[in-house]
Regions:
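Cytosolic juxtamembrane N-terminal segments of multi-pass membrane proteins
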Residues: 1-9, 77-84
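Membrane-water interface of transmembrane alpha-helices
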Residues: 53-74, 140-143
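Short membrane-interface loop/juxtamembrane segments of multi-pass integral membrane proteins
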Residues: 69-97
Length: 158
């Protein structure tokens, strides 16, 4: 998804970040509901996917970007803009580990849903959210490092 300058600014609203966190377990429940309501599960699943897609555009500009959630989004913006040009080893190793952990947790989550295993699904959902939080925390760290040497990035803080 490509976001404009304005869309990135709106996505940095903490409400955007926290509602995405809250939406993920709801998405899992929507997919899981296939075991209960059959193909009607596509309705809540599509609604959740739609919400996650439009989420970056739903909220107003944040009153301040001096918070963890906003800095996580700004860090992701830096990471996507700079790619591997600037990614210190301390971050690259962790990002690679997070990719492996995320794939393992996603596979476990899918398996849990397919097998109708409530415990595996719940644990995998929690693990996905923990992994996302760890990734976001790294984005905050990356942003905090880059903001010191880049005036454009500093202008994103208010």
């Amino acid at each position: 998804m490509i976001l404009s300058e304005q869309s990135w600014a709106r996505h940095a609203n903490p409400w955007s970040v926290w509602t995405r966190y809250a939406a993920f377990p709801l998405l899992v429940i929507a997919v899981w509901s296939y075991h209960v309501i059959g193909w009607w599960a596509l309705v809540p699943t599509a609604a959740m996917v739609g919400f996650l897609y439009v989420n970056p555009w739903l909220f107003a500009l944040p009153r301040s970007t001096q918070n963890w959630a906003s800095k996580a989004v700004l860090g992701e913006r830096v990471w996507l803009a700079e790619g591997k040009r600037y990614l210190p080893d301390q971050h690259a190793r962790v990002f690679h580990a997070l990719v492996v952990l995320s794939l393992a947790n996603a596979a476990a989550l899918v398996w849990g849903i397919v097998q109708s295993d409530v415990v595996l699904t719940a644990i995998s959902t929690i693990n996905v959210l923990v992994g996302k939080s760890w990734f976001n925390d790294r984005m905050v760290w990356l942003f905090s490092e880059r903001v010191r040497s880049n005036p454009e990035y500093r202008s994103w803080l208010y």
